[in-house]
């Protein structure tokens, strides 16, 4: 169940669901999702579903990972390395989405507020020999100002409102995608222009909440 063939079947399902960016699909195919899930869940690693990680967190559904990255890359493939440039991820979890991003972006900064998860992420990324990801144990709502600004910000937990710190850390010309909402949630795409921010509400989604502090 962990073979490349199984992984490619997952990619075909993503294509069937509407993911058209072949570069994103190739990145999804390159990352062995089974090493990022609990051993007891390894047989379900390539299902298109979120899976529990412990600590009330989940590893995101593959379709949502691909969809968010596709939104961030659209129209920027020629202007930025990997269509993403320098990327900030909020909610690194076990490191799966960071590993996918790292197939495309030259530099990925990933923040996680739960210490046991970030230790697992470090181990998983080391196993993959993925050395262009910098992991930080910190409050994701505050972003990572020391490496700002970012061309791309991706958030893997739902905020009641867009965190101001993340807006400040987005470069002019940059894009951010994140789920917004307490009850009903939707993906929001935010683009920073010289004049300000453009915000577009997109797909209905369900994510764990974006919490403050660390644990």
List where the protein language model places each region.
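Class I SAM-dependent transferase core
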Residues: 1-88, 100, 104, 117-131, ...
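Conserved nucleotide-cofactor-binding alpha/beta core module
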Residues: 72-198
């Amino acid at each position: 169940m962990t073979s490349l063939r199984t992984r490619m079947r997952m990619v075909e399902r993503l294509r069937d669901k509407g993911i058209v960016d072949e570069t994103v699909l190739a990145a999804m195919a390159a990352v062995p999702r089974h090493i990022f899930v609990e051993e007891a869940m390894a047989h379900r690693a390539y299902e298109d579903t979120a899976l529990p990680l412990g600590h009330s967190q989940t590893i995101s559904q593959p379709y949502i990972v691909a969809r968010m990255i596709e939104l961030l890359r659209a129209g920027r493939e020629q202007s930025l390395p990997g269509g993403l440039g320098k990327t900030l991820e909020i909610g690194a979890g076990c490191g799966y989405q960071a590993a996918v991003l790292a197939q495309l972006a030259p530099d990925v900064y990933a923040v996680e507020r739960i210490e046991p998860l970030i230790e697992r992420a470090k181990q998983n990324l080391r196993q993959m020999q993925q050395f262009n990801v910098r992991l930080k144990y910190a409050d994701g709502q505050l972003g990572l100002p020391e490496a700002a600004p970012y061309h791309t910000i991706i958030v893997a937990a739902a905020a009641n409102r867009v965190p101001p710190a993340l807006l400040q850390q987005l470069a002019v010309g940059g894009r951010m995608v994140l789920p917004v909402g307490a009850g009903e949630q939707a993906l929001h795409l935010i683009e920073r222009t010289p004049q300000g921010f453009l915000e577009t509400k997109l797909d209905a989604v369900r994510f764990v909440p974006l919490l403050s502090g660390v644990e």
